[in-house]
Amino acid sequence: MIKTVVSTYGEFIGEVDEGADVVVIKKPKMVIQSEKGFGFAKGVCVTSVSEPEEVTIQKANVVMVVDTNPEVLKAYEE
């Protein structure tokens, strides 16, 4: 299921699989904001490949996992 994950590093959208100690996000997109609204970064950090298959975040660094706004989900899927 596609979810929004807010971590201590940033906000991500993707298919979430929660493990005991980690959250794995498949097909992750990092959410960025500008004066014109929100968008998606080309990678998940400055030096990552442009579209990683997945990222793993330690649960200690996850602030929350929530359902994604339908409009944002539509933009993610495009």
Language-model features, listed with the residues they occupy:
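Conserved RNA-binding domains used in RNP assembly and mRNA/RNA metabolism
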Residues: 1-78
